Amino acid sequence: MTEESEETVLYIEHRYVCSECNQLYGSLEEVLVHQNSHVPQQHFELVGVADPGVTVATEATSGTGLYQTLIQESQYQCLECGQLLLSPSQLLEHQELHLKMMAPQEAVPAEPPPKVPPLSSSTIHYECVDCKALFASQEMWLSHRQTHLRATPNKAPAPVVLGSPVVLGPPVGQARVAVEHSYRKAEEGGEGAAVPSVAAATEMVTEVELLLYKCSECSQLFQMPADFLEHQATHFPAPVPEAEEPATQQETLVPSPTEAAVSQPDPLPASDHSYELRNELRNGEAMGRDRRGRKPRRSSSGESGATQELFCSACDQIFLSPHQLQQHLRSHREGVFKCPLCSRVFPSPSSLDQHLGDHSSESHFLCVDCGLAFGTEALLLAHRRAHTPNPLHSCPCGKTFVNLTKFLYHRRTHGAGGVPLPTTPVPPEEPAISFPEPAPAETGELEAPELPVSEESSAEPAAPGTYRCLLCSREFSKALQLTRHQRFVHRLERRHKCSICGKMFKKKSHVRNHLRTHTGERPFPCPDCSKPFNSPANLARHRLTHTGERPYRCGDCGKAFTQSSTLRQHRLVHAQHFPYRCQECGVRFHRPYRLLMHRYHHTGEYPYKCRECPRSFLLRRLLEVHQLVVHAGRQPHRCPSCGAAFPSSLRLREHRCAAAAAQAPRRFECGTCGKKVGSAARLQAHEAAHAAAGPGEVLAKEPPAPRAARATRTPVAPSPTALGGTTSAAPAAPARRRGLECSECKKLFSTETSLQVHRRIHTGERPYPCPDCGKAFRQSTHLKDHRRLHTGERPFACEVCGKAFAISMRLAEHRRIHTGERPYSCPDCGKSYRSFSNLWKHRKTHQQQHQAAVRQQLAEAEAAVGLAVMETAVEALPLVEAIEIYPLAEADGVQISG
């Protein structure tokens, strides 16, 4: 197979990865040759009973009864039957023969081998090959062997001696899990101490089994891929099958003699390790096992092709594989072992120790799709291919594989008696996502936001063979990946608990990153500013501040964000969705932490308290600045643009100053009124204001209207006839965004929060009292500025003259003294001012003059009206003499006729 590469020169895609060390290769031959380096040559020496520690070479003419057997291994070996092959092509052809064996062949009962005397009739002790220490159980021996593995990780493999467990260390430079060996005690076959023959020794050596499949979740080892796949299914939630007809009472309660023999627990513990030596004879009779050492499964219906089930004699629990039954029986005999960090349960202390090593290991490579962390980049690259819609090796059942060998072994599980292949991929059911119920508005508790389902994802069908998430429109190649994505991303399942503070998380990697907050460990420094972080994800988000990249952009206003979660929260503003309401003042927020920060202003007690004085602060930065200035007597680092103080230069470099952004040159110009703004988002918001005000109004160039006129002005949509066209010929006007209108003064606002703050002007509400003097304010920022009057803090200093101010706005007004800028001009007389407050005071003089002029005009008008009445009465006297006045008969009235 030739190496396939992309059209680009810089990137070459490797299609094959080694399952042991995760190295990437471009052809199958290279990875097969490389995998041969992971299989060490193993020497099995059969030692006599009298002196098990002595090794004697075999001689053809000797009659001592000691033998030495050497197992040779070829370059290419079938992992299923152990046959040796000479080339990769022969290995592939041989594996295809296994695929064609769809129907299981009936095993021909072999002749019973000659009786082999036991190796030892006494109790077996487990001996360590390094320090010669003896142990009474496998668990104690395994725990002891872990100390040697951690001390000497690159030790060369030692010879395996029958009768004593041996641990083979990994080769130098290979990051592999050590392959452990253990042996089961041989059964007593009869009396006598005859030395086994060469044929018997050879047959015993051929019974050594290699367990090549290791579970990544619990580190258990398996020989057959079917047992490995069945075990892996226990770690993932399987779909609930339809209700089947219950078995008859006879099948459930009356087991057959064969079933009773199978359901009994083994007298010896099952081996979990890579090699297992079994004596197949018991008192001259073969045990009920096949040629590979597997127990025969019990059929629930009596037919060979039916579903096979195994029952536990202690609790009547049903299992689908002998390995599951053996693990369950071990839990009855030895109990279970629980992890103190993640509450997972393991059947043996060795698997628990290996799992605890996963908690302490570092994972530097994070998958951006599912959040899983990996120790090497090769593992991450191999994992990333599972997220692609068209993986390298895809099975019709929905599973994908990167390694061709594992894919071929998986295909055999769909043979006769296995899992049938689906004719068409079954689309996943709509996930039942549960969110916490929102609290009533009057309780003041947090209300959970409802995530809107995208109309595009529901209307647009997914590609054939893929599964699409209905909430975020992402596509997956397997239903299992979609289920995992919905569980970790959209569902609020938090099953992993921190053992220190009790906080719950969705993934174990999140717990590991969270534990570093307790230990203070920050192993991921930024290469630009050297700031350390406790997780690679936080480091990746931080590096966006240096590059200036904002990959997540809002489609409504064009504003860009560094995180997708921030964009989702921002879109709630456009949707006018504010689910979090304050019980005290009724202000609503679209983020829960903003409501939490808002509540501190009502209580007056802030979360960050100083240990040396009774003061408290809303932000940790303010507390650090306070401790630096007041208690340490040092000057903080200040931003030259806005004057904000920071405890360190690193925090100052991270600061993104809004004042500096406002002083930057404005490059975006409005096509309607010519106004220039500093960003595309502000330009779109400004153009939206034009659309809300109507096409006939100009916002920026016309002088500001009087306050009464601005308060009563409302946008009026012009009719088609007023624009000079007919209703049929005029094009459809674009949908305009209407702002939020105040019911009292008809003033328009762009956000709900601005409207809520404005309404306090009409209601007179001031929900933010000062804890020092009791003065109340309408906004929390006004209270924060006011409290500096009590503390005497003036954090905003002028860089020209050194004068300090308590409010940043006062500093901005003061800078105009040095620059001579007067941006606020009066529309009536043209006089300009440095601050808006001075302009407002000046406008009051015009209003007073205008009111005085109006009063004078009214007085003059009243005087003119009175004079005109008097003059009219004098001139009418001659006319009154000619008027006849006579009484009415029906009513007391006067009728004048001339």
From Swiss-Prot:
Alphabetically, the GO molecular function entries are: DNA binding; zinc ion binding
Asymmetric dimethylarginine modifications at: 834
Q: Which residues carry this modification: Phosphothreonine?
A: 726
* Any one of the GO BP annotations: regulation of transcription by RNA polymerase II
Task: Identify the GO cellular component terms for this protein.
Answer: nucleus
Query: A single Pfam family, by name?
Result: zf-C2H2_6
Is the Zinc keyword given for this protein? yes
Q: Where is the composition biased (Low complexity)?
A: 707-734
Q: Where is the composition biased (Basic and acidic residues)?
A: 273-290
Q: Where in the cell is it found?
A: Nucleus
User: Which residue ranges does the record annotate as region Disordered?
Assistant: 243-305, 417-460, 691-735
Q: Which UniProt keywords apply?
A: DNA-binding, Metal-binding, Methylation, Nucleus, Phosphoprotein, Repeat, Transcription, Transcription regulation, Zinc, Zinc-finger
Map the zinc fingers (C2H2-type) to residue ranges.
16-38, 76-98, 126-148, 213-235, 310-332, 337-359, 365-387, 393-414, 467-490, 496-518, 524-546, 552-574, 580-602, 608-631, 637-660, 668-690, 740-762, 768-790, 796-818, 824-846
User: What does this gene product do?
Assistant: May be involved in transcriptional regulation.
> PANTHER family per the record?
C2H2-TYPE DOMAIN-CONTAINING PROTEIN, KRAB AND ZINC FINGER DOMAIN-CONTAINING
Family, per the entry? Belongs to the krueppel C2H2-type zinc-finger protein family.
Q: This chain belongs to which protein, by name?
A: Zinc finger protein 574
